[in-house]
Amino acid sequence: ASDVYKRQEQWQGFCGSSFWKDPVRTAGQLRLYLDADFLLQDPSAAEKILRSLTEKEIQSVIALPKILRLRDGQYLEKLRKLLLENLAYINGFQAANMEHIALLKQWNFTGKEIYGDHSLYLWNRTSRDFWKAFLDGYCLPLELNAAEQRDILDPAFPAEKVIYGRIPMMVTANCVQKTTDRCQPQENPKALDLIDRYHKRFPVQRNCTHCFNVIYNSVPLSLHKELCKWSGLVTGRLDFTTENETETLEVLEYFAGTRKELPYGEYTTGHEKRGVE
């Protein structure tokens, strides 16, 4: 989900982390997914960010907006121009749906990798084999349990696994703000929460650039106790959504091994054990 102001804070948190300050231990092994909206907000700053990542041997992968419409033509042309100007510093793109695959094929950025997000639903070996023709890697589906995820692993098709981050419960073209009140597109949208009958708060991120919402789980997914079971099988992925600069830094330091105390209280292990039917 795009929230350029949160992304700016998260970028600052990353720049203060061990992953940035001590790049030698992760040289060539670290991949950073950068939100396209965040980069397009300030093209000159985007160039500096992409160049600095290349200098530190950190892979830059551009994450496209979750929902795109025909009216986004002008936005896409601006984005394509920005990407072309900085193509030397970009390693690839993240595709969250089939429309992204078609768009990237149309743009034809030769030599750039495409990584599928978990929303592409590679639920079994058949779908995995289908996507091999279009992707250079993929993210394991959040809905499958650990055993089911292992069943679709293929050494010839690199997989990543989300080990931290708020799980998106829904990506919707309907806006919570507009439905409950009125449309209020603004430069810095106020945070919204949905509250259930148990008084749990579910953060809502509004993307006013493309007019969609992402509703996140009330607590983050955290598989810090499961990491040893996946060592050597997948690449671990940290997803930052509602975190500010300090929270981002604390989570990064914990998973970097430089912080001993878990920086958050409540968390969920998602479908790691039970899966879905």
Where are the language model's segments positioned?
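Active-site pocket-lining/capping segments in soluble small-molecule metabolic enzymes
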Residues: 2-277
